Swiss-Prot record:
GO MF assignments: 4 iron, 4 sulfur cluster binding; metal ion binding
Signal peptide: none
Family: Belongs to the NARF family.
Species of origin: Aedes aegypti
One GO-annotated biological process of the protein: iron-sulfur cluster assembly
Full protein name: Probable cytosolic Fe-S cluster assembly factor AAEL012261
SUPFAM superfamilies for the chain: Fe-only hydrogenase
């Protein structure tokens, strides 16, 4: 029985994120009609040949692009089963090999500046896999990328901080002027956003925060701000992000994140933790310890930080709920809170924090991970019984540390046990303070002292789109 109501049908839905094996995107194949008939044969290399009276013709391979996937309402939560041609390690290695060859042949017009942006969750996943500390892991991963031909390897902290600050400001504005669009729901998880657009559409979209995810904020910083610092056009930069889930590939491919001015995407390629492991294995590197480390780059015009792998509040998914809770308490009610206490409700993936004074609830926040909890929240909202002001939503159980593309557990270890170890590592990281010199620098030098609201809206915020359900026989489940 489906856990979801109505006519919605999901494939392989549970809270263990695995690739979907079904795709119902209808593809029209143009064929030439022959009066004499034709015969199709499969060649030794797997290609298809059509024999007609006029000779042999090789049939084109059907490919489903990321744009097709985003515009389709067939599958809902998982992008892994789609043929992703532009977001793969093979495509990355191809681009880097071609770039290295262009450098070697002094073909300067063809050379691109390659920048890697690495999130902290993949670093922790790889650190656990290779039994290294997080900072050492990051430096050795950077060394590996530099050996492949990367020009720069940076962390995501500046984008993480900007996303938190913009989210907190958006929450306070909604609380003061637009209560009907509450609870405000976090927007950094592309699996959740994709599900919301395809399943609940215009009902749910006004509740989702418009603040971009850290990946997409970093895309703007690299293609526009860093490009200006380097004196390189944005379309000459090839921007790669390393993320903990496959759905980040879909997010990077949204048309909303394509710059018409620069004629390029903010993020060109997304690879994941498990793909890094596969790349290392493919080149015969069994131990990351054998890779020569390289310092993490810091291209921003502020002092270099003391560390490059940071924790954000209590959540391994960005810390949105706790950070916004504490800020809202101070900003709206002049109450200082050192640490928000999130109590476990029905399960470990559903928690809430309440700010209550003299019996009056001032703020009620929740963290809901996994689609079971997400669906319950949505149904409460539809029934008018959701009394939260903010909900941090992540599609994966336990959040981003347990992303669907993190390195798999060793034999004899369960995913839950591995996630617990990653959470313990995360709690040992230095604590980030989003209000820092680097973030202030972005606002003053790139966003014009934050006075240009149009610029902030364009670069740090986005919009969502309802995707109509296709009426096709391929949707029918028997």
């Amino acid at each position: 029985m489906s856990r979801f109501s109505g006519a919605l049908q999901l494939t392989d839905l549970d809270d263990f994120i695995t690739p979907s094996q079904e795709c119902i995107k209808p593809v029209k194949i143009e064929t030439n009609k022959s009066k004499t008939g034709s015969k199709i044969t499969i060649q030794d290399d797997g290609s298809y040949m059509q024999a007609t009276s006029s000779g042999l013709q090789k049939l084109e391979k059907v490919e489903i692009t990321l744009a097709d996937c985003l515009a389709c309402s067939g599958c809902i939560t998982s992008a892994e089963g789609v043929l992703i041609t532009q977001q793969s390690q093979e495509e990355l290695l191809k681009v880097m090999n071609e770039n290295n060859l262009a450098k070697l042949n002094n073909q300067l017009d063809s050379v691109r500046y390659i920048v890697f942006t690495v999130a902290q969750q993949p670093i922790l996943s790889l650190a656990k896999r290779y039994n290294l500390g997080p900072e050492e892991t990051f430096e050795r991963v950077a060394g590996y990328f530099k050996k492949l031909g990367a020009d720069m390897v940076v962390d995501t902290k500046i984008a993480d901080d900007l996303s938190l600050i913009e989210s907190r400001n958006e929450f306070v504005e909604r609380f003061n002027t637009n209560r009907q669009s509450m609870p405000m729901m976090a927007s950094s998880c592309p699996g959740w956003v994709c599900y919301a657009e395809k399943t609940h559409g215009n009902f749910i979209l006004p509740f989702i925060a418009t603040t971009r995810s850290p990946q997409q904020i970093m895309g703007v910083l690299v293609k526009k701000y860093l490009a200006k610092i380097l004196g390189v056009p944005g379309d000459r930069i090839y921007h790669v992000t390393v993320m903990p889930c496959y759905d980040k590939k879909l997010e990077a491919s949204r048309e909303d994140f394509f710059s018409d001015v620069d004629n390029c995407r903010d993020v060109d390629c997304v690879i994941t933790s498990i793909e890094i492991e596969q790349m290392l294995d493919g080149t015969g590197i069994q131990f990351l310890q054998t890779v020569e480390p390289s310092p993490i780059d810091w291209p921003w015009p502020t002092p270099r930080p003391s560390a490059f792998v940071w924790a954000h509040e209590s959540s391994g998914s960005g810390g949105y709920s706790e950070y916004i809770f504490k800020y809202a308490a101070r900003k709206l009610f002049n109450i200082n809170i050192d640490q928000a206490e999130f109590k476990i409700l029905r399960n470990n993936d559903l928690r809430e924090a309440i700010l209550e004074i003299n019996g009056e609830v001032l703020l009620r926040f929740a963290i809901a991970n996994g689609f079971r909890n997400i669906q319950n929240m949505v149904q409460k909202l539809k029934r008018g019984k959701c009394n939260y002001h903010f909900i941090e939503i992540m599609a994966c159980p336990s959040g981003c540390l347990n992303g669907g593309a993190q390195v798999r557990p060793n034999s004899g270890q369960t995913p839950r046990e591995l996630t617990a170890e990653l959470e313990a590592m995360y709690k040992m990281l230095p604590q980030s303070n989003p209000e820092n010199e680097a973030v202030e620098m972005v606002y003053t030098t790139f966003l014009d002292n934050a006075g240009d609201n149009n610029k902030r809206k364009e670069f740090l915020h986005t919009s969502y789109h309802q995707i109509e359900k296709m009426n096709t026989a391929l949707n029918i489940k028997w």
